[in-house]
C-alpha cells in the first residue's frame, strides 16, 4: 500500500473525505470553503514541481484544522511563469482557462450552500493572480489570499522580496518537507529590479542563464522557513479568519 508523504493536519475538514450529510452539518455552522490553488511548475533543480502547491496545501490544512472550516480538494494547476528553458514535467493553464474552471467550481459549490470562498495560493505570478481575483459568483463572497503578498524581506539575507524558487520558497520547503529539497542543486540567479517587475507581470521569461530559480536559494534554512511560515499563518489568520470581512 502506498502511504502519502504528508498526512493532512489532524482535524482538517477535508471535503474530499466527507460524506454529503456531514458536509451539510458543517455548512450549517460555517458556510465557508478554503480552496488551495497550486501549480505544477519548476522552481529550479532543487525543488519539486509541486513546491507552490505543497506550501498552499499545508497552510490550508492548518487553517481548516484551527478554524474547523471545510477545505476543498486542491486545484493542482495554475498559470506558470514562462521560462526560456524547457522543464520536464511542467504543466500550465492559460489565464482564461483557470478563470473559467474556478468560475464553474465556485458556481457548483455556491449552488449547494457555500457562501464564502477563500482562494489561497503561493504563486504570485500576475496572470495567475488575475485569474483568481476576477472569479465571479452570484452572491457568495470570494477572497483571494496571495501568501507572498505578506512581507518576508526582513527574514531573508540575500533578498528584499519573494522571487521564484528563491530563499523564501526553499526555506519554507526545508521547514515543511525537507526530504523533497536538494540543497546541493540550488543555484542563485538575480534579476534587476526592472527585470523583476517585468517578470512578475508575465512580460519576461525566466532567462536561459538561470537554472530555473530567481533569487538566492543557497541561503535558505529550515529555521528561516519556520519563521516565514508562522508569519504567513498568523497574518492570514488575523486578516481572513479573525477579522470580519467588510460589507460589500
Model feature map: region roles:
Residues 1-248:
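Extended, histidine- and acidic-residue-enriched regions that form the cofactor-binding/catalytic faces
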Amino acid at each position: 500500500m502506498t502511504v502519502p508523504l504528508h498526512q493532512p493536519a489532524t482535524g482538517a475538514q477535508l471535503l474530499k473525505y466527507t460524506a454529503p450529510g456531514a458536509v451539510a452539518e458543517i455548512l450549517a455552522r460555517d458556510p465557508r470553503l478554503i480552496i488551495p490553488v497550486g501549480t505544477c511548475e519548476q522552481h529550479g533543480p532543487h525543488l519539486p514541481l509541486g513546491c507552490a502547491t505543497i506550501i498552499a496545501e499545508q497552510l490550508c490544512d492548518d487553517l481548516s484544522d484551527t478554524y474547523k472550516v471545510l477545505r476543498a480538494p486542491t486545484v493542482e494547476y495554475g498559470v506558470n511563469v514562462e521560462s526560456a528553458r524547457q522543464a520536464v514535467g511542467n504543466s500550465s493553464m492559460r489565464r482564461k482557462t483557470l478563470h473559467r474552471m474556478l468560475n464553474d467550481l465556485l458556481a457548483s459549490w455556491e449552488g449547494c450552500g457555500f457562501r464564502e470562498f477563500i482562494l489561497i495560493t503561493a504563486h504570485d505570478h500576475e496572470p495567475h493572480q488575475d485569474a483568481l481575483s476576477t472569479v465571479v459568483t452570484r452572491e457568495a463572497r470570494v477572497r483571494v489570499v496571495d501568501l507572498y503578498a505578506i512581507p518576508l524581506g526582513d527574514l531573508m539575507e540575500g533578498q528584499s522580496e519573494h522571487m521564484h524558487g528563491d530563499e523564501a520558497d526553499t526555506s519554507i520547503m526545508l521547514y515543511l518537507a525537507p526530504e523533497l529539497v536538494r540543497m546541493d542543486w540550488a543555484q542563485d540567479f538575480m534579476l534587476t529590479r526592472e527585470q523583476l517587475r517585468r517578470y512578475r507581470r508575465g512580460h519576461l521569461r525566466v532567462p536561459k542563464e538561470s537554472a530555473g530559480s530567481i533569487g538566492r536559494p543557497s541561503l535558505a534554512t529550515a529555521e528561516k522557513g519556520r519563521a516565514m511560515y508562522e508569519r504567513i499563518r498568523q497574518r492570514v489568520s488575523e486578516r481572513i479568519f479573525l477579522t470580519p470581512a467588510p460589507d460589500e
